[in-house]
């Protein structure tokens, strides 16, 4: 389970990251990333719509995505906000495939380096 410090909980934060973040498409997900100030905790949010499947299937996909993000935190990932939107194909994907999608999104963000401006708080507005 992700710690509270590693979760995006505000709808405004979700909206801000999805609208202003760098978009990285994977086979089973689309990720939106924003760099944050150095030393800040990495935060994650998940969007799993009914197109993915039944409630049981959606929760399974969400738990797998959370576990993949937890591994990134354990590996020392900091200073990024990441929202992962699961595509319908995620319903049939196994854990390694979902983990690869998330890891690819983060690695592409790291290659871009400081080109992404640090995320402003949702209170600052769009």
Report the location of each language-model feature.
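Positively charged, solvent-exposed patches that mediate nucleic-acid binding
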Residues: 1-126
